[in-house]
Amino acid sequence: MTAPVALRDPAVISAESDTLRPAAKSGSAFHQGARDALRWLLVGGPGPLTGGITGLPIPLRAVVAELSAAEAVIYGRPSGRRDYAMGLEHALMWAELATETAPTTARGSERSTRQ
C-alpha cells in the first residue's frame, strides 16, 4: 500500500469544488476538469482521465497516474480534451499545495485556444 497524498483541508477542497460548479456546468472544459479532479480527491472512485478505481484516501500513485495522463493530453497530439486536462492538472497541483493559485482564479481556460 502506498502513502496517501498530503492535501489541503477537505473543507477547502470541497468549497473550491462548489465554487467551480457554475463555470463547469456552463461548458468550461478547464473548470470541469478541475472540478472532476477535486471531487475525485474527496470521494474516490474512477480517476477522471485514467478511469483507475481508487478508494480513500487517494494513494500517491493514483494522483501521479492522473497527472501523467493529463501531461500526455496537454503535450501530446492536438486534442479536444486539452483544456479539461489542463484544469485537472492545475486542480491536483493546487490541492497538493504545489501552487497557491486556486482553479477558480487560474487563467488556463482563457489562454488555451490551441487544439
Residue ranges and their predicted role:
Residues M1-A6, T113-Q115:
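Eukaryotic intrinsically disordered, low-complexity tracts enriched in Ser/Pro/Thr/Gly and charged residues
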Residues A3-D18, L56-A70:
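Short amphipathic alpha-helical heptad-repeat segments
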Residues I13, S17-L20, H31, R35-L38, ...:
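Generic L/I/V-rich hydrophobic alpha-helical segments across diverse proteins
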